[in-house]
Amino acid sequence: MLKQLNFKNLLASIMLGVFAAISTPAMATNEAMLDLLEILVKKGSITEGEYELLVNASKADGENVEHNINEMKAKVAKTTKKMPKITTKGKFKVASQDGTWEWQPIGRIFWDSMYVDNDGGTLEDNGEELRRARLGFQGKVKPMSYKLELDFANSGTPSWKDVWLAYNGKTDAGKWWLKIGQHHVPFGHATISSSKYMTMMRRPLFADGPQLSRNVGIAGRFQSKAKNRWFAHAGVFVPGLSTASDETGQAATDRRTTAFRVGGTPYYKDKNHLLHVGFSYQHEEHKGDAFSNIDNTLLTHIGNGDSLEANFGTNADDSDAFDIEAITVMGPFHGIFEYVTWDVSDPIGGDVDLSAWAIDAGYFFTGESMKYKYGAWSGIKPKKPLGKGGLGAWQITARYENMDLSDMDNTGGGNTSTADDGGEADVFTIGLNWYPTSNTRIMADYSKVLDFSHVDLAGTANDAVEPAAFQMRAQVYW
């Protein structure tokens, strides 16, 4: 009996010592330890008095630890209250604690390789190209926002991209902003969507040609509050800056462009199931300056710029352009249709009607969806990024497009060209996109000219040729 009591006392002493040794702040509030004490007292390993003593000590320590933790939290919060927040999730951004200001460096690098079959002609070129190399920053100081970005890919000469300031506001009906500087002309979807998110290496023929990208001007935009479903965007512009030292855009400052774009989602189930429709109008007063010449390559960015050409010289009085667009996102599938037409007033050659259209579609094998935001594409987030248990996002895309400049008479308007029209082409492209992470992408496109005619090339090596090209791109942006 004595041995049994001594054993119990010894066991109790050991338990008390062990508990004292391990009763750190983290363990003092551990429910598992309280359960263990209850088991020991039921088995008689410790007395009721010892049990009460240990439980009370544990609770007291727990309250003391919690108090100390709360004090530490309060001190940290007080110390860091005025310090800026730094976030690095995919992009680096510095912002104030109250959200009144933020600053973010931005940039992108696109490197392209092209392998061409010219079908006996000379319209396209093989090679590699640093397609885009941009650096800049963006941010806000409420209620203002700002952006500045330069591209260094044009033979080493920096060129301005976005350079603007905006005033932001909101009403019960939605959000709005008023922007001044160099920014996108509100016309069409293909040009206004960022190159970071376009599903092909090249935009459609009409977007890389006569559609204005950025000009200097003032514009306003309104976005409805209800699920951001409807928007209106309008502005007045003069020619844009071209190089970092350019002040006037090297063009007539009295040339004016007025444009607007309206659109929205008449069908919206959720962000991955929607239908967008849009309409744009653009009026240019050329004032003796040249019409935005359509001077397009067919397949690659470094090809022959005279494949499709509409040159009015300096005789175009004005021009009107109309654009209709439709976009659908249905889970991993997306589709786009866009049609644009130009009516150019030339007092010597007569009025000319030019047109182009494109239809493209894509599908994510890995289940992602194209991200539609405010009438344009936005970034893709792979469900399982590379390096985090997955292989990124994989997407197949296809596009068929046509540009018809056959109504153009390049012999008129003082133009010395011997051409009778600007040409017409049909091009088909199929592509494969791999998104290892949210900010990186590898692209592979195969493009084929299915039909091509241009009277100016009759009897030459490029007469009715149908070239093809395989292109690849590696891109990163931040």
Placement of each model-derived feature along the sequence:
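N-terminal secretory signal peptides that target proteins for export/translocation
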Residues: 1-8
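Outer-membrane beta-barrel pore domains
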Residues: 121-122, 167, 171, 281, ...
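Short solvent-exposed loop/turn micro-motifs enriched in small/polar/acidic residues
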Residues: 87, 158, 211-213, 317-319, ...
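N-terminal periplasmic/intermembrane-space "pro-region" immediately following the signal or transit peptide
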Residues: 2, 13-17, 26-106, 365, ...
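Outer membrane beta-barrel
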Residues: 90-287, 354-388, 393-410
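Short secondary-structure boundary/hinge segments and terminal tails
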Residues: 58-59, 156-157, 345
